[in-house]
Amino acid sequence: MVMTDPIADLLTRIRNANVVRHGVVELPSSKIKKAMANILLQEGYLKDIEEYNDGVVPMLRLSMKYGKGKERIVTGLKRISKPGLRVYCRKEEIPKVLNGLGIAIISTSKGIVTDKEARKLGLGGEVLCYVW
């Protein structure tokens, strides 16, 4: 089966695991998924990332992070720019998610960065998703 939107697949797997409070999510690896997972790790939404090869395709194993009593750390994920409707922003238009409580993940000419890093670098780009 051909996957038309691997970023939406990543977000959906994380969202579904979060809802049922699974400890680990496994998915096929790619550069963009790895970069997004690293951002989620740096921002404190994931506990750990592991890359392994199952013999057929490289895989990512994401360890979910929960608070006390399995309280969810990730309360929401939303795909913004989709294959059918790309959403771009200039450096002046970089969105703030929940007035700074969440993050926007943006694909720029310097790679995939958070909204805060994009503002610091003075770069715009494609708004991939919001996480809060």
UniProtKB/Swiss-Prot annotation:
SUPFAM superfamilies: Ribosomal protein S8 (SSF56047)
Gene3D superfamilies linked: 3.30.1370.30, 3.30.1490.10
Pfam families named in the record: Ribosomal_S8
Protein family (similarity comment): Belongs to the universal ribosomal protein uS8 family.
Purpose: One of the primary rRNA binding proteins, it binds directly to 16S rRNA central domain where it helps coordinate assembly of the platform of the 30S subunit.
GO molecular function annotation: rRNA binding; structural constituent of ribosome
Matches recorded under InterPro entries: Ribosomal_uS8, Ribosomal_uS8_CS, Ribosomal_uS8_sf
Domain of life of the source: Bacteria
Gene Ontology CC annotations of this record: ribonucleoprotein complex; ribosome
Keyword vocabulary terms for this entry: Ribonucleoprotein, Ribosomal protein, RNA-binding, rRNA-binding
Assembly description: Part of the 30S ribosomal subunit. Contacts proteins S5 and S12.
PROSITE patterns linked to this entry: RIBOSOMAL_S8
A GO biological-process term: translation
Name of the protein in question: Small ribosomal subunit protein uS8
Cited HAMAP family: Ribosomal_uS8_B
